[in-house]
Amino acid sequence: MKVKCLLAVLLLSATATAFAQEAKYGIKSAILKKEAVTMGQKVQGVQYFDDYGRKEASELTMKVGGVANVEKHIRTIADGDKIISIDLDMKVANKATLPVKPVNYLNLTDEVRELHKIKEVGTEEILGRKCTKYTLEVVYGGQTTYSTVWIWKGIPLKNETSSNGMVIVTEQATEIQENAE
C-alpha cells in the first residue's frame, strides 16, 4: 500500500511538469537532474524537455520495499492532456488523464492565480539562477495540498508540498543542462 501511495504522489509531482500543450518554459530545451524526498523515500529524477516544454518526459529512480531495498524505475511521458507512466521494471504502462492542469508560470492569468490562491512571496537563487518563489493551493478529490515552488523561466527548480500539516514532497534541481540536444 505504501508503494502505491508513494507512486501516486510521485506521479502527481511529475504531472506538475508534464502538461505539454502550450509553451511553458523560457528556454527551448533542458535536462534537469533532481533529488526528492517523498514520504521519507529518496527519489532521483531526471526531467527532459524540448520545444519550450511542449515535449516532456521524466525518469524516476527510487528504492522501495523496506529491508529488501528494491530499486524502482519509472518513466513518464506527456501526451497532451494525458500522461503515460511506464514501470520499467514490471514492463507495464498506464495512461491517465491529468487530474488538474499544472500551472503555467510563464502565462499566469488572474483566473489561475485566484483558483490556486497563488501568491508571489519573494525571490531566491537556486543553482545560480534567480527564482521567483510562489505559494499555492491545489484541491483535488476533496484534498487540499499546499506548495511552495521556486520558478526560473517557468521551470520549477524547487518544490515543497504538504497536506494535512505534513510535508509529503520536497524536490530540488541539482543540475541543469540548458539547450540540451
Language-model segment annotations:
Residues 1-2:
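N-terminal secretory signal peptides that target proteins for export/translocation
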Residues 5-14:
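Sec-dependent N-terminal signal peptides
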Residues 15-20:
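Sec/Tat signal peptide C-region and signal peptidase I cleavage site
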